Amino acid sequence: MKLTINKKQFLQSWSLAERSTSSSSSMNILSSVLVKASFEGVTLQATDIRTSIICTASGVTVVDPGEAVFPIKMVSDLFKKAPGEEFTLDVDDGKVILKAGRSKYNFSTYPVREFPVLPSSKEAKLFCKVSAGELLMVIEEGTLAASTGEEYPLYLSSANFLTSNGILNIVSTDTRRLAMSGVPVFESSDGVNALLPMKGIKEVQRILSSLNSDSPVEILYDDAQFYFRAESLEFTVRRVESRFPAYEKILPKGHQTFVSLDRGNLISALERVDVIVRDYNRMVVLDIVNGEVLVMRGKAPDFGQAMEEISAEISGEDLRIAVNSKFFMEALKVLRDPNVTLAFNGMSGHMAVKRVEKDSF
């Protein structure tokens, strides 16, 4: 196999494959990328067993077709630090010669036969079709409450994907809070739901961020995997073998107090009050009285206290309630809307952070 490579263009594709490898695995083959070259194009394949990717490499001219498995640890640095804008790769019998200007490097590849066969979406069913921008938004909002570590029960570090009536809903929880977001999709299989691990979802987010927001994304599924197809790549995430709790039963109903206000003003005020409480208990108190001002207070013993007044539209019952400033801030910042509605169902109930006049978050 012999390839001529435009470094800048190729590294964009290579970085996608590189992130899907495993740096901690005892199996060297999982810390590698399979390169398959034909005169029709070049594909890159990588996996850490839980996730995998197949993508078309850009910036590559195929002189001689072939395939090889490149170890990530050293090769990635060589690709990135090779001098000039172009270099060549010449692979013969497991040995590679990389030439860039006057520089020349030799290294070995792994056996192609040892590279695992990646999951295939050929027999997979359609889950839904949605634009990259809409999918990125619903993932960011819907996974807000998921735990970042690998916790047990497994659903705590996962997010539930489900389709119903043409809506893709994503839900997550860490038992202290619950996030739910939905978006209309082009096509969908109603009634399908699955748990996906946050590690894989985070990589989907990174991929979506690199795409045009209008780019169509096709999501497919089978009993073991979810497949995300977009432009010239397919990313696969293994499903979590667990069930998400029946969250519908704990959703707050019958709100009695509503506060609508500018999201940016609320975030700024909360950040200032958080300066006082963040090293204590991170609790802020909201004084809500029917009218046009929301009062926010924070207090830390032996340090000080803060009080903010924010213009708002308030309706319903008067209320004083304490909330966690960190959780409150995260919910406000994940929303992209200029305004936000806070809904309450009493002092001992929950607070819901919602879009104004919408139930999509």
Task: Mark where each language-model region is.
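Structural preference for solvent-exposed beta-strand-turn elements
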Residues: 1-361
